[in-house]
Amino acid sequence: MKKFIVFLAPLFISTLLSAHPEEPTPPVSTDVMWHTITVVDYKPGTVDEAKALIQKFETASETSGTTLPVIYWFESGKYDLVVTWKLKDGPADLKGKWSPDGETWWNALIAQEGSEEAAIKLQADYNELIASSVTSVARKAK
């Protein structure tokens, strides 16, 4: 889970990059772009609160100069949100806990929130809003 702290903290953390250990890591190919795609179902009545917390995560990303994910809000169906992240180094970004961008983003979130404890609480508060999420790895031809 290297490239992660990805969606925005918990979206960065909880909903991104759930690579299953039994699944093999696909080979890297130069003719494709790799992404993670996460769909999120929030608990009833919590979407507005989730949007407010996501804004804080996005602000930390903008401050740190790290890449923002592409976010879509659903108007129908089971899920409320889909988040896609480009994996700069392909599936290798899924190994380990932190990428350099993730660490930079995390430090910006700590500075923004005033302490590491406050940043951790923000992540926990966000995670409490999630009823379920599913993350998959996808590739797209260049």
Q: Positions of the model-derived regions?
A:
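Short, surface-exposed ligand-recognition loops at beta-strand->loop->(often short) alpha-helix junctions
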Residues: 41-52
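A short beta-turn/loop motif at secondary-structure boundaries
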Residues: 72-79
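Short hydrophobic/aromatic beta-strand micro-patches
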Residues: 41, 84-86
